[in-house]
């Protein structure tokens, strides 16, 4: 199938939303132990997607109308073949954009190979610009590696760069100005994010939750010259500042209202297809990827998952079990 014919196909759910974006967690392994995501003693046994099977899946999804692939984890750079996966995805007819979301620990050493493979964008998860806070949040002393990776990203004009900064009340909310300052000289988007309502709703027990409205108020108080702009569908608030090259966004996770424009599917490292971040019912793709069913049946499973997408993830999440972000893939 050539690129033009692939573009004629569209995946649509029962509410009329087009699904053209798939996040693939290539591994469940992670080299950090962020306090809001993984326990220090989290199991070391991990799942990892096979390159051949993943390539087959990407080609099939592209033929069904998927245009964007994002590799996640766990930590995707722990997958030994991540540059190859990027190259394969980028070369797949119908796929226009290939990105990764990473904690950045291994990014400096792999960045050249990823760019050469055709990577379009990087979302770097970075919650603090302070080394001591970084070690406290992640339980690992890897700040220097991540800081170097950020410098490299900002010096790579071919990449779309976004910082995902999870706001933790009483821990890093005082760093909002420091993160905003990065947008002055650099064409990146700093995205302040609410904690995700997973892990048995631990966010409420810790008292660290900082809502999107409170983040917006802090920004408005500090920067009265903020100008509202149109951002990505998940960026409920998006702003620019006069004299700044980059932009600022706020992403709700609990107080969200962007379900109506959701275009995503998620594939976990054990080959489960999840239609909604908050609705954890899944469809097992492993038998199909291992050749135990034909392509027609695999397509049926994907369409079934698309049709399972709930209209409102918030309502759906009340009735499903909690999972960690490392399991779901972000």
UniProtKB/Swiss-Prot annotation:
The record lists the lineage as: Bacteria, Pseudomonadati, Chlorobiota, Chlorobiia, Chlorobiales
**Which EC class, in a word?**
lyase
Alphabetized, the UniProt keywords read: 4Fe-4S, GTP-binding, Iron, Iron-sulfur, Lyase, Metal-binding, Molybdenum cofactor biosynthesis, Nucleotide-binding, S-adenosyl-L-methionine
Query: Which reactions appear under catalytic activity for this entry?
Result: GTP + AH2 + S-adenosyl-L-methionine = (8S)-3',8-cyclo-7,8-dihydroguanosine 5'-triphosphate + 5'-deoxyadenosine + L-methionine + A + H(+)
Cofactor comment text: Binds 2 [4Fe-4S] clusters. Binds 1 [4Fe-4S] cluster coordinated with 3 cysteines and an exchangeable S-adenosyl-L-methionine and 1 [4Fe-4S] cluster coordinated with 3 cysteines and the GTP-derived substrate.
Which residues lie within the region annotated Disordered? 309-330
Tell me the GO BP annotations in alphabetical order: Mo-molybdopterin cofactor biosynthetic process
**Needed cofactors:** [4Fe-4S] cluster
- Function noted in UniProt: Catalyzes the cyclization of GTP to (8S)-3',8-cyclo-7,8-dihydroguanosine 5'-triphosphate.
Under PROSITE patterns, the record lists:
MOAA_NIFB_PQQE, RADICAL_SAM
Q: How does it assemble?
A: Monomer and homodimer.
Please report the name of this protein according to its UniProt entry.
GTP 3',8-cyclase
């Amino acid at each position: 199938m050539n690129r033009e014919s692939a573009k004629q196909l569209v995946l649509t759910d029962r509410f009329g939303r087009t699904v053209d974006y798939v996040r693939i967690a290539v591994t469940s392994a992670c080299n950090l132990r962020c306090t809001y995501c993984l326990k220090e003693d989290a199991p070391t046994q991990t799942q990892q997607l096979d390159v051949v099977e993943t390539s087959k899946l990407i080609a099939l999804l592209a033929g069904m109308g998927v245009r964007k692939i994002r590799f996640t984890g766990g930590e995707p750079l722990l997958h030994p073949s991540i540059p190859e996966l990027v190259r394969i995805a980028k070369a797949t007819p119908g796929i226009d954009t290939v990105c990764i979301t990473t904690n950045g620990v291994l990014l400096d050493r792999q960045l050249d190979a990823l760019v050469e493979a055709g990577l379009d964008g990087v979302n770097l998860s970075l919650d603090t610009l302070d080394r001591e806070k970084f070690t406290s949040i992640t339980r690992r002393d890897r700040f220097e590696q991540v800081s170097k990776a950020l410098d490299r990203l900002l010096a790579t004009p071919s990449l779309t760069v976004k910082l995902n900064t999870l706001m933790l009340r009483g821990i890093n909310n005082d760093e909002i100005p420091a993160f905003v300052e990065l947008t002055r000289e650099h064409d990146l988007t700093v995205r302040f994010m609410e904690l995700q309502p997973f892990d048995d709703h631990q966010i409420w027990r810790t008292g660290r939750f900082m809502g999107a409205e409170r983040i917006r108020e802090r920004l408005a108080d500090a920067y009265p010259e903020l100008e509202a702009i149109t951002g990505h569908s998940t960026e409920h608030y998006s702003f620019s500042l006069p004299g700044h090259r980059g932009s600022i966004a706020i992403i709700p996770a609990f107080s969200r209202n962007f379900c109506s424009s959701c275009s995503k599917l998620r594939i976990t490292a054990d080959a489960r297809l999840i239609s909604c971040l908050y609705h954890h019912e899944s469809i097992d793709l492993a038998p199909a990827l291992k050749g135990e069913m034909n392509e027609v049946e695999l397509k049926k499973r994907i369409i079934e998952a698309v049709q399972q997408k709930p209209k409102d993830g918030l309502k759906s999440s009340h009735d499903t079990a909690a999972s960690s972000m490392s399991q779901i893939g972000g």
